[in-house]
Amino acid sequence: MSLLVKICGLTTPETLDAALDAGAEMVGFVFFPPSPRHVGLTAARELGQQAKGRALKVALTVDADDATFENIVETLRPDLLQLHGRESIARIRDLKQRFGLPVMKAVAVATSADLAPLAGYADVCDRILFDARAPKDATRPGGLGATFDWHVLEALKLDRPFMVSGGLSADNVAEAVRITRAGGVDVSSGVERTPGVKDCDMIRNFIRAARAAEELSVQ
């Protein structure tokens, strides 16, 4: 299976085009006001139209309420919901039933003990995203540029596709794929000049490095 590449936190037509033209399979839009990558509904509508038919559109939320989800789904028409908060299994099941969309649940990882909830999530989620656990005083759960010990996932047995994120860049994505055997990689801060400001060349370089990692993994 080919490696999926997701560029998350896109906010401008130029950086979105860079991701699409370089072959990203997924493009992520953040709907969380504390994040420097947050997009409003008007911008999301325009970016969604730009990405339509070229990549899967992913809506990232953090413990959003029903009204927020309804606005996002109506405006962006996402292909996948990414839940990055403390959403319960019951909440995830309700969202899937309500909107008829697949769900990717983010699981914050620092040690192997953080993998304990996986059994429950795997029963209801379509995909799992492993991200570095944020510090206790962080104002947002991801996009902080921190990595986690990828060796925690070495012995992982999961009957759902999974991706890795957290501090990925063109310099370390190959090592992350080699160790975790992940089916996809997700980057945000690793392709930015400053928080929330994506760089087109960094996006292209990351995708190029991910493709090289993919080739090595099948040799």
From Swiss-Prot:
Record's keyword terms, sorted: Amino-acid biosynthesis, Aromatic amino acid biosynthesis, Isomerase, Tryptophan biosynthesis
Molecular function via GO: phosphoribosylanthranilate isomerase activity
Superkingdom: Bacteria
Enzyme's top EC category: isomerase
Pathway: Amino-acid biosynthesis; L-tryptophan biosynthesis; L-tryptophan from chorismate: step 3/5
Family membership noted in the UniProt record: Belongs to the TrpF family.
Assigned EC number: 5.3.1.24
Reaction(s) this enzyme catalyzes, per UniProt: N-(5-phospho-beta-D-ribosyl)anthranilate = 1-(2-carboxyphenylamino)-1-deoxy-D-ribulose 5-phosphate
Gene: trpF
Upper lineage: Bacteria, Pseudomonadati, Pseudomonadota, Alphaproteobacteria, Hyphomicrobiales
UniProt record, GO biological process: L-tryptophan biosynthetic process
UniProt-listed PANTHER family: N-(5'-PHOSPHORIBOSYL)ANTHRANILATE ISOMERASE (PTHR42894:SF1)
Name listed for the protein in its UniProt record: N-(5'-phosphoribosyl)anthranilate isomerase
HAMAP family the record matches: PRAI
Keyword Protein biosynthesis attached: no
Pfam families named among the record's database cross-references: PRAI
Source organism of the structure: Bradyrhizobium sp. (strain ORS 278)
Keyword Chloroplast: no
